[in-house]
Amino acid sequence: MMTQSIRRSMLTVMATLPLLFSSATLHAQANSVQQQLEALEKSSGGRLGVAQINTADNSQILYVADERFAMCSTSKVMAAAAVLKQSESDKHLLNQRVEIRASDLVNYNPIAEKHVNGTMTLAELGAGALQYSDNTAMNKLIAHLGGPDKVTAFARSLGDETFRLDRTEPTLNSAIPGDPRDTTTPLAMAQTLKNLTLGKALAETQRAQLVTWLKGNTTGSASIRAGMPKSWGVGDKTGSGDYGTTNDIAVIWPENHAPLVLVTYFTQPEQKAESRRDILAAAAKIVTHGF
């Protein structure tokens, strides 16, 4: 099995196949996926990045997967996971209460705004951040951890040398083309999401909690989930920002198949461009076809 980085002009499907499949068949399959993703990207007018890991054999489908994209709210997975990691050595941590003040509220607070002048537990903040993309909840998690650099430090502890969180909500969503702040690559995020949800990065209880939060996400019905059969299980975290940046990262459980980890990042050249969740759904359908 070989591994290659894929730029815009190339997409490689890496797999261990039964001997009855010829190299010509593999080449044709790779070309088909490449052509479909290239056509999708061209029609969108934006920049698309995709990374999928098939955990049955660790084969990968990669498209522009080593270029940086603004993470936007997909970074909330790392912050929540960092708090879960802390809870491995403090069984009471997730019940710790955090004060919510009116001055804490930012641009999107569907859960936190209901608790102004009250408190939320760290567990409630994690659920709010991941399942409702509550930005105040994310900021409270970041503050608890000690700042954006501590979220980055947690990523480094997992072996992720690419992820970087520099700011809090909502400024981390500026997604300025070429700005390295608050970015990662599709491949790096896919590998880390796999480690967090299916690997050993978290203890079993904490890993199960993260998966539960992701499966309960309420914001992803038009993104990766829209490209999946209804019978498949999906846990995901969406994100959006300026320049029409539209993201979704997911763990997928196809019927009768090992899980897939899929990252889809998309951005556009105009600052006020509209989100394009349909592009993510289409990309997901392309790369999961045949499972």
UniProtKB/Swiss-Prot annotation:
Changing residue 277 to N: Confers lower levels of resistance to cefotaxime, ceftriaxone and aztreonam while the levels of resistance to penicillins and penicillin-inhibitor combinations are similar. InterPro entries: Beta-lactam/transpept-like (IPR012338), Beta-lactam_cat (IPR045155), Beta-lactam_class-A (IPR000871), Beta-lactam_class-A_AS (IPR023650). Residues 1-28 form the signal peptide. SUPFAM superfamilies: beta-lactamase/transpeptidase-like. It catalyses: a beta-lactam + H2O = a substituted beta-amino acid. Its EC number is 3.5.2.6. Keywords: Antibiotic resistance, Hydrolase, Plasmid, Signal. Substrate binds at residues 237-239. GO terms for biological process: beta-lactam antibiotic catabolic process; response to antibiotic. One of its GO terms (molecular function) is beta-lactamase activity. Pfam families: Beta-lactamase2. It comes from the Bacteria. The active site is at residue 73. The class A beta-lactamase family has a specific amino-acid numbering system, sometimes called Ambler or ABL numbering and often misspelt as Amber. A multiple sequence alignment was used to derive a consensus sequence and then the consensus was numbered taking into account insertions and deletions. This allows use of identical numbers, e.g. for active site residues, despite differences in protein length. UniProt always uses natural numbering of residues, hence there appear to be differences in numbering between this entry and some papers. Has cefotaxime-hydrolyzing activity. Belongs to the class-A beta-lactamase family. This is Beta-lactamase CTX-M-4.
